[in-house]
Amino acid sequence: IHLRYWKGLDKSSDTRLDNKEMVGNLITQRKNRIDFILRHSETGIKKTLYSGKRIASYPELAIREAVTNALAHRNYFRHGMEIGVDIFDDRVEILSPGSAYGGKIRKGDKDLLSLYPWRRNQIICNVFSLLHRREKSRPGFEKIRASYHLYSSDRQPVIDCDETVFKITLFDCLYESPRDKIKKNGNQNYQKIIAFCSVPKSAAEIAN
């Protein structure tokens, strides 16, 4: 498994803030991968009416289910390809060798619930279920989708896959693009100007 933490929004950056290659049994790989992603995730406080609500870059349930899915449904007969985790400023991408059910090609698909719950590796799936690492009764993609239900459409998970690889992208719920920051700061400055002008002032006060 290759785990990479990039500076920026793509792999064109010359700076990798963290880079690890991990081996071991599937349970250890699962734990190490989840820990790697959570370690490089941020947490914050969202203001509510009376207090604050703690929020994270990614719903932890979504991370756990996406990681488990990559291990449980990987095509282990496809040599020369490894499971990859790439963390960028605004998202985490988890790539696994092996197609979706029926080899259907998907590009930027947000309809996770349409994915057929097909088990490529029955024994691995059963082991994860016995160890309470996954549920038999509820598909992982359904839980991933549900964990993002409070967020806007542009933050919803995306699936890309073809006949050889399957990739799920989870977007950082705390990320603010430069445009968002400009808009946010601009609105704050606008409100300050309105507040200043709403109160009568002398020429001297305005000059200062």
PLM regions: where:
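C-terminal regulatory or interaction extensions
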Residues: I1-N208
